[in-house]
Amino acid sequence: MATISDAEALSKLNFEFNGGDKRPVSEIIKCLNSNNECVAVATLMNEVIGFGCAQSFKSFCYNEAYGEITEMYVKKSARRNGVATSLISFLENQLHSRGVKSIKILTGRDNNSAIKVYELSGYVMDDEVMLMKELE
């Protein structure tokens, strides 16, 4: 699991991943300390080379909690070495310990390398459609 000492590295990796404004380290620390989010990091020689995030949800509509892997990023130089697969497995175990029985992952329809990793980890595509609306 990520710790506050990983916050600076997470800020840099998130910027590589999402672009836009770099997330302040103080905000990352606040999230790590108070959120329902599981944040996993992968390291190589004491350097954070990837991260994955997951959340669990419980609704009165369903008997069991469900989870979602919301973010997954591995530095380009560290890809194709099983890092993402290890992060997925770790997050699955964390969610399972919270009582989660099923996990969703959302990724871009053209992100073929990510889709392949998820499928190799046992995930299957379904026919759901995601809709989004920006609120002002």
Protein language model regions, located:
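Conserved acetyl-CoA-binding loop-helix of GNAT-fold acetyltransferases
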Residues: 71-74, 80-93, 116-120
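Acetyl-CoA-dependent GNAT
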Residues: 4-64, 70, 125, 134
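Hydrophobic adenine-recognition pocket in adenosine-nucleotide-binding enzymes
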Residues: 2, 72-74, 107
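Residue-level recognition of the GNAT/N-acetyltransferase active site
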Residues: 57, 75, 79, 108
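Conserved GNAT acetyl-CoA-binding A-motif
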Residues: 88, 95-107
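Conserved active-site alpha-helix within GNAT-family acetyltransferase domains
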Residues: 85, 101, 109-127, 132-133
